[in-house]
Amino acid sequence: MREILPGVFTWGSTYADRPWDLNGYAIVFTGGTVLIDPPALEEADWQKLPKPITTVVLTNRDHVRDAVLFRTRHGARIIAGKDEVSQFSPLTIDAVVQEGDLIDGALRVIHLPGKSPGEIALYLDPAYHAVSRKMGGILFLGDAIIGNPPGALGLIPEEKLDDPKTLRGSLPKILDYQFEVLLLCDGQPVLSDAKQKVSEFVKKLG
């Protein structure tokens, strides 16, 4: 685990069948720590993780990862997009969110269907968060865009997308937001000029 930005921690898991890491994130708020798509943690990193852990946000059905363990050990609530809830069965989702909602007063929900019906992105709104304001805006993405090949942006294999056309139509929406940092739950994060890089990628998709 490492602190990738002030008050924002990341850790990951590596799998032999894919060339990119699976990343989770922890954002420290005044009222507690919010996790995004958390993979398994080494016991030593459990001790480092800022407490209390109040919330786990899942961006899509395939990113449950270790969410249940965080709920069991810390009593964290699990949140997902309202159009994705049925995709998690038999996992119980504690609260649902939709386009425009704020989680913990600062994480803005962006609905990005295509990979799955209710995938969400999370925008750490600079209006409500000092670090995001200082960094020029921070965006978290689950599977809508991944950091592969390393150092570049890409999509997951098309056979894993419910509706590739819908996903391509959803992606321009994130360009309505101002961000310079892109923290990806699959693959390498982009720590500078992220919006420009996303804009160029979206244009290439057509």
Which residues does each PLM region occupy?
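Short N-terminal binding/cap micro-motifs at the start of the first secondary-structure element
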Residues: 17-22, 44-45
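Short hydrophobic/charged patches on amphipathic alpha-helices used for structural packing
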Residues: 24, 46-47, 171
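Metallo-beta-lactamase
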Residues: 6-9, 15-17, 32-35, 41, ...
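Short conserved beta-strand segments at catalytic cores or DNA/RNA-binding microdomains
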Residues: 24-28, 144
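Active-site HxH/HxHxD metal-binding segment of metal-dependent hydrolases
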Residues: 39-105
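Residue-level detector of beta-strand structural context in well-folded domains
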Residues: 23-25, 99-101, 120
